[in-house]
Design a protein with these regions (language model features):
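Alpha/beta-hydrolase fold active-site neighborhood
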Residues: 119-286
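Conserved alpha/beta-hydrolase "acid-adjacent" motif
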Residues: 301-306
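Catalytic histidine-centered segment of alpha/beta-hydrolase-like enzymes
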Residues: 326-335
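Short beta-strand/loop motif that positions the catalytic acidic residue
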Residues: 294-296
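Conserved hydrolase catalytic core segment
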Residues: 32-68
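Single conserved hydrophobic/aromatic residue that forms the stacking wall/gate
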Residues: 1-11
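A catalytic-pocket lid/entrance helix-loop region that shapes and gates access to the active site
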Residues: 53-109
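Conserved acidic catalytic loop of the alpha/beta-hydrolase fold
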Residues: 19-33
């Protein structure tokens, strides 16, 4: 059981308490001020800490920031659209490098291979089904070569409806044996960074699904419970319970995984049976010695761009946008981001740059 792992009452966990624990660590280290770097949830922790203890923050970088006005369900309920976009970007990426990955020379061919593997591995209600990308010239069968445009127009008009019908039919399938180490697990990582795309390609070339080990299941259980505890204890978003039956209707009518994800997250079902026991801190950077920095990818799949802008406004921060959709800017292969952040920490805490390029990616 969870409590035997020494976590105590996990449902009392919240970011404000963690921030106060963090300050105890600062005191123990004998540091009057600290520099703080936080990514993803760490941006919320950093903003809360800086609000509670502004006199102890020197320089603060928030990378891929959460929306401080949408804690927490509004943040989760706006991820699906960017994740759908990211999927198609990945299919485009593989197709443009077919000589390297051998997954198909059009996004549709790559998608078809991906979708077949997903179907074999996961079959049933939890299968993450998505629509096909548009067909291109390379997808036209030989017998239609004289009427390429007519074929593409007809195909691309009909395919979304066909996909929706197929998803509705598959909704009634019995699930396969569950192997949590699968293509969808790796694809989930690939949402966050192109760094993982080569792993997706390698898996697609040689699929080997595996179940979680006993130790992995225990670790996942602890992680999930802590995540749920912090989220539900602090949630200030009004749940939309009508989205729950809407999810069921959408599911059996063939909605894709990203539409369903947004509906489920915003419904509040994750926190069913629990009530918030605190209110999120109204974060502010008004009392900080130096202005913080917020880094945000335009198409971030986990913490959408607009939320980062709101965090920058609340914290009176320098706002620097990065091309692409990586969740985390400084943490990947982006020398210009490294230079900006390192100069901010080690030299003058002033940032004049407002834009960064997409991180580089090792295609192998």
């Amino acid at each position: 059981p969870l409590w035997s792992r020494g976590l105590g009452d996990v449902y009392k966990r919240q970011t404000e308490n963690t921030a106060r624990d963090f300050d105890m660590a600062r005191q123990y280290l004998g540091q009057h001020t600290i520099n703080f770097y936080g990514a993803s949830y760490g941006t919320w922790l950093g903003a809360v800490y800086a609000t509670l203890f502004p006199e102890h923050i020197d320089r603060l970088v928030l990378d891929s920031a959460v929306d401080p006005t949408g804690i927490w369900m509004d943040n989760f309920g706006s991820q699906g659209d960017m994740q759908r976009r990211r999927m198609y970007e990945m299919f485009d990426f593989f197709a443009a490098r077919d000589n390297l990955y051998h997954l198909g020379d059009t996004p549709l061919k790559v998608y078809t291979k991906w979708y077949r593997i997903i179907g074999r591995e996961m079959q049933g209600p939890t299968t993450p089904r998505i629509g096909a990308p548009p067909a291109q010239i390379g997808d036209v069968p030989p017998q239609f070569k004289r009427n390429i445009q007519l074929y593409l127009t007809g195909y691309n008009l009909a395919r979304p409806l066909v996909d929706r019908i197929e998803r509705a039919l598959h909704a009634w399938e019995a699930p396969n044996e569950k192997n949590e180490h699968n293509l969808w697990e790796i694809t989930g990582l690939a949402f966050t960074s192109r760094t993982y795309w080569s792993q997706v390609a390698a898996y697609m070339q040689n699929p080997q699904p595996k179940p979680l080990t006993k130790e992995e299941k225990e670790e996942k259980s602890v992680s999930d419970n802590v995540f749920r505890a912090v989220t539900c204890n602090e949630n200030a978003t009004v749940p939309k319970p009508l989205n729950l039956p809407a999810t069921g209707i959408a599911y059996f009518m063939g909605a894709d995984i990203f539409t369903l994800k947004n509906l489920i997250a915003s419904s509040g079902i994750m926190c069913l049976g629990t009530r918030p026991n605190t209110k999120p801190i109204n974060v502010t950077g008004a009392f900080l010695k130096n202005r913080p920095v917020v880094l945000q990818s335009i198409y971030d799949t986990q913490t959408p761009y607009a939320g980062g802008q709101k965090m920058a406004h609340a914290m009176n921060a320098y706002f620097v946008k990065a091309d692409g959709g990586d969740h985390g800017v400084y943490v990947y292969d982006n020398p210009e981001a490294w230079e900006l952040v390192n100069n901010y920490y080690l030299r003058k805490p002033i940032v004049t740059r407002t834009k960064l390029p997409y991180a580089r990616v090792d295609e192998h």
